[in-house]
Structures are given as structure tokens and as C-alpha cells.
């Protein structure tokens, strides 16, 4: 007897452009103890239990997300190993609406294949992802939020003229002995630069954030408390891909996103959704409900939300960030035609190896990332990306275009009502 033996693909590899979302759902279920007391029991329930899982994915949004990341750099011609990913969540619920990246789902055997990977670039390592990617200036809204919480206004004047702070300068840090932290990581003090030349001026806090000027950021930081920033970052779930806090008090570079590990797009989108929903954080979830083979509902997944910011503070951050994508902002070319109903922040790490645009409307919060997972800190500057070679790449370049493409298509299908104007106190000049 001659047998015609062939292998049959199974599982998430059959899910097409939803393959990585499928893998995320499986890993999410593997951590759900309602499916079994042990990982082995949960795995059996998932694979052999005949369960039907109803997810939160919006097929139209997923198609738009996949088109956006593939337009940045198609997998088939990705000779330079440039990665792109995008995740969108619904503020106020945590529903994951879309999740895409510019690779096919692979296995460890595909480690040298530029078109495939086993890693989901959108999620943390616990869900099949990575340790994250340095957030760059997308961390700055947390500093802004703490600035507003401390009673300072968005239009208050900031000294943005300094690129150096001596070791003798005591940063406010109430969780340290004596209430001060003295930076000794460099013998002469803490130094840094702005992404572009200039910007060493006095101006408003809003101006400094909208232009993404590091000199303004540290001018603001010198007036507030590092320990408060750290606590707020944890409260807002600013965690790296291993689940640890992104922010580190001794490492002043983490305040501009120079973190040890990085953040995932899903975590970043969920964090920015706090501003979109006027201060409410909702844990991201990919599932609506699970039904049994007979159609009986086994479990309905509920929103898990908590108020982590005062609504006026969140609205103040939105008031500032909407200026980023308005004329005069650092990503003004990346607006989506909703000048009072959309907001965003770009992020670029030191050598442009990781770039971001994260932004939102009331109805969607979307994180867009372009960088490199396999090549570490390899810069995108001067690298061929889908036929283009640019001398300088920042968050607005490719990640911003990705974000804009997706949001222009999908955001109008959700809530695009204008943001609430913050109080006079938030907009004050002192």
C-alpha cells in the first residue's frame, strides 16, 4: 500500500492576518484559572474542550491595521529586518480591537527568516511577546500628568535652556533619605540633548511637550518629585515587557524613555487610553465570552477598570497632546482631521532604533511602533525601508504614518467627540 502522507497545519497558523492575535488569545486563556487550576488543565480545556471563543477583534479594523504595517515594510522584501507593529484598544472597556505586525507567524526554526517570527511584537513576554521596546518620548505624558497633579499649569513657564545638571543638584525625591536624590551616574552630572538643534528657551510646559524638547522635560522634572513620577507610572500601568516598572528613579534617562527594557504596543495603547477615557484604566482583554459545544455560555469577560487619574488631569494631558498633531506640533503632518478630538505623542530613542506614535480619540487608543527586534539598537537612520532611505527617522516618520493610516480609516467608526476642555486651573500660567 502506498500512502500519501502530508502534514496539516493546525492552530493559529491558519488564522491568516489574525495569527498573532490568535496566539495572544491562547496565551491569555492559558493564564485564566477559571479554565483549570493548572496550566496543564487549561491547555487541555483549550485544545480539547470544544470551546467557542468570541473575541473582541474588529475584522475591519484588523484589515486596516495589517495594511498599515505592511505598507511600512512588507515581509517579503524585508531584507533589512525592519519590524512594524500596531495595536488598538477601546478606552473605557479595554477591548483589543486590532493587533498586527509585518511578519508571518513562525517558529524557533524560522529565526533567520526575515519574513517570519514566533514573537508577537505587540504584547509582553508572558503572552508570547518580547521584553518590549524603548518608548522614547511617549513616556513624557506621565511627567506632564504629574506636573499637573502637583498644581502647576499647562501654560506655566519652564526653563528649557539647560542640557546639563551638576551632581550637586538635588532632585526632589521624598522616598530618599533627606528628600533629595543626587545623580552620580556620570562624573560631571546628568547631560542630554534635544532631538533637534535649538529649543533652549523659556516657554510653557505645553510647548515643551508638544515640541518634545528634553530640555523642557528636565526643567519640569526639576520642580516636581521623582518618587511621585515613579508612583504615578506604576499606577498608570507603565510596565515593561517583563511586567516590571519602566521608570527607575536612579536612572534619570528613564524619564525620556531610555529604559532598560521597553514597553509593548498593547501596554502603551492601554496606558494612553487612560487619557482618552478621562482617567480610567482598563486592563486589555481580547475575549468577550466562551461558550460550550451546546451553545451554553461558560464565561463572559467583564471590563476590569479603575479610575487612576482625576478627569481634569486627564483632560489637561489631552489638551496638550492634541497640539502635537495640530499645526506647530512635532507631528503636525500626522493629524487625522479631528483637531479637537484626537491627540498623540511621538517617541524616538537615542539612535532611532525604536520609533513610536501613540495616540487616541475618545473611542480608540492606538500604539504604532517601527523598529528592530532582532538587531537590538541598530538605527533606522540610513536604512532601506520599503524602498526609501532617510538620513533621519523619528516617531512621526514611519510609525506616525502607520498610526495615521489606521486611525483615519477606523477612528471615525468609533466615538470622535471633542475632548472636554480642562479647568482654568489646569490651563493656568503658574
Regions inferred by a protein language model and the residue ranges of each:
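Sec-exported extracytoplasmic/periplasmic mature domains
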Residues: 1-6, 26, 30-34, 66, ...
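Non-catalytic, structured segments within soluble enzyme domains
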Residues: 1-56, 239-240, 253-257
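Surface-exposed intrinsically disordered loops and tails
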Residues: 5-16, 34-39, 43, 91, ...
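Loop/turn elements at helix/coil->beta-strand transitions in domains of secreted/extracellular proteins
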Residues: 82, 92-96, 152-154, 227-228, ...
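Conserved catalytic neighborhood of penicillin-recognizing serine enzymes
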Residues: 152-229, 251, 293-323
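Mid-domain, small-residue-enriched loop/turn segments at the edges of structured enzyme/sensor domains
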Residues: 174-182, 187-189, 225-270
Amino acid at each position: 500500500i502506498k500512502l500519501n502522507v502530508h502534514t496539516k497545519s493546525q492552530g493559529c497558523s491558519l488564522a491568516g492576518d489574525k495569527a498573532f492575535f490568535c496566539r495572544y488569545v491562547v496565551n491569555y486563556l492559558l493564564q485564566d484559572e477559571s479554565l483549570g487550576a493548572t496550566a496543564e488543565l487549561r491547555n487541555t480545556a483549550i485544545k480539547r474542550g470544544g470551546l467557542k471563543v468570541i473575541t473582541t477583534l474588529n475584522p475591519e479594523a484588523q484589515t486596516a491595521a495589517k495594511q498599515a504595517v505592511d505598507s511600512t515594510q512588507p515581509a517579503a522584501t524585508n531584507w533589512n529586518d525592519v519590524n512594524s507593529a500596531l495595536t488598538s484598544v477601546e478606552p473605557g472597556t479595554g477591548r483589543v480591537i486590532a493587533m498586527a505586525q509585518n511578519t508571518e507567524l513562525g517558529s524557533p526554526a524560522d529565526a533567520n527568516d526575515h519574513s517570519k517570527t514566533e514573537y508577537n511584537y505587540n504584547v509582553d513576554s508572558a503572552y508570547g511577546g518580547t521584553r518590549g521596546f524603548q518608548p522614547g518620548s511617549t513616556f513624557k505624558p506621565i511627567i506632564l500628568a504629574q506636573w499637573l497633579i502637583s498644581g502647576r499649569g499647562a501654560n506655566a513657564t519652564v526653563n528649557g535652556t539647560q542640557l546639563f545638571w551638576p551632581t550637586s543638584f538635588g532632585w526632589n525625591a521624598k522616598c530618599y533619605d533627606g528628600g533629595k536624590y543626587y545623580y552620580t551616574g556620570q562624573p560631571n552630572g546628568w547631560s542630554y540633548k534635544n532631538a533637534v538643534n535649538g529649543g533652549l528657551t523659556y516657554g510653557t510646559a505645553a510647548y515643551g511637550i508638544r515640541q518634545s524638547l528634553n530640555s523642557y522635560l528636565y526643567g519640569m522634572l526639576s520642580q516636581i518629585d521623582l518618587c511621585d513620577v515613579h508612583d504615578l507610572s506604576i499606577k498608570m500601568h507603565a510596565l515593561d515587557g517583563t511586567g516590571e516598572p519602566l521608570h527607575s528613579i536612579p536612572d534619570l534617562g528613564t524619564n525620556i524613555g531610555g529604559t532598560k527594557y521597553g514597553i509593548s504596543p498593547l501596554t502603551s495603547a492601554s496606558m494612553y487610553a487612560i487619557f482618552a477615557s478621562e482617567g480610567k484604566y482598563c486592563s486589555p482583554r481580547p475575549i468577550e465570552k466562551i461558550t460550550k459545544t451546546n451553545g451554553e455560555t461558560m464565561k463572559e469577560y467583564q471590563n476590569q477598570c479603575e479610575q487612576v487619574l482625576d478627569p481634569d488631569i486627564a483632560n489637561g494631558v489631552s489638551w496638550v497632546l492634541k497640539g502635537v498633531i495640530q499645526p506647530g506640533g512635532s507631528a503636525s503632518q500626522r493629524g487625522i482631521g479631528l483637531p479637537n478630538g484626537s491627540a498623540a505623542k511621538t517617541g524616538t530613542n537615542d539612535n532611532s532604533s525604536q520609533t513610536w506614535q501613540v495616540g487616541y480619540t475618545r473611542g480608540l487608543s492606538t500604539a504604532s511602533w517601527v523598529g528592530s527586534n532582532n538587531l537590538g539598537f541598530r538605527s533606522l537612520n540610513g536604512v532601506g525601508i520599503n524602498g526609501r532611505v532617510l538620513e533621519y527617522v523619528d516617531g512621526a516618520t514611519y510609525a506616525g504614518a502607520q498610526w495615521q493610516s489606521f486611525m483615519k480609516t477606523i477612528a471615525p467608526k468609533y466615538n470622535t467627540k471633542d475632548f472636554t476642555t480642562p479647568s482654568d486651573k489646569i490651563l493656568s500660567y503658574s
